[in-house]
Curated annotation (Swiss-Prot):
Gene3D superfamilies: Nucleoside diphosphate kinase-like domain (3.30.70.141). The active site is at residue 117. The lineage of its organism: Bacteria, Pseudomonadati, Pseudomonadota, Alphaproteobacteria, Hyphomicrobiales. InterPro entries: NDK-like_dom, NDK-like_dom_sf, Nucleoside_diP_kinase. It comes from Methylobacterium radiotolerans (strain ATCC 27329 / DSM 1819 / JCM 2831 / NBRC 15690 / NCIMB 10815 / 0-1). It is an enzyme of class 2 (transferase). Its cofactor is Mg(2+). This is Nucleoside diphosphate kinase.
Length: 140
């Protein structure tokens, strides 16, 4: 098992409801370390670049609007098989289908406002981290 990093965003629905501490507790209880964290207001340009893979999807505009509607918390998480572990901890995209104890089961309001984003691969984690963090921002 390899130590790796993954990227996380606590979305505007989470920050609006002051869930940062509660979500961080679930992350840390799962054995992941938060080695980088910043609360930011994502710009339209940042959101469009970040979700570029969904540009042709019908929900793209709504997604960009949502992600820029309030502060988000961007994070770098580190641990054994961090990408897979965090995806398990997040739970299914649809909170109704998420397993008990997962972030989305506990906190998500809907498929669209599902509290968190997590990288889907180690390669994407590197790209996503680089969009929001310099190496000097990460303290392992």
């Amino acid at each position: 098992m390899a130590t790796e990093r993954t990227f996380s965003i606590l979305k505007p629905d989470a920050t609006r409801r002051n869930l940062t501490g509660a979500v961080n507790a679930v992350i840390e209880e799962a054995g992941l370390r938060i080695v980088g964290q910043r609360r930011i207001r994502m710009t339209k340009e940042q959101a469009e670049k970040f979700y570029e893979v969904h540009k042709e999807r019908p929900f793209f505009g709504e997604l960009v609007t949502f992600m820029t509607s309030g502060p988000v918390v961007v994070q770098v998480l580190e641990g054994e098989n961090a990408v897979a572990k965090y995806r398990e901890v997040m739970g299914a995209t649809n909170p109704a289908q998420a397993a008990e104890g997962t972030i989305r089961k506990k906190f998500a309001e809907s498929v669209g406002e599902n509290t968190v984003h997590g990288s889907d691969s180690a390669e994407n984690a590197k790209l996503e981290i680089a969009q929001f963090f310099k190496d000097s921002d990460i303290a392992a």
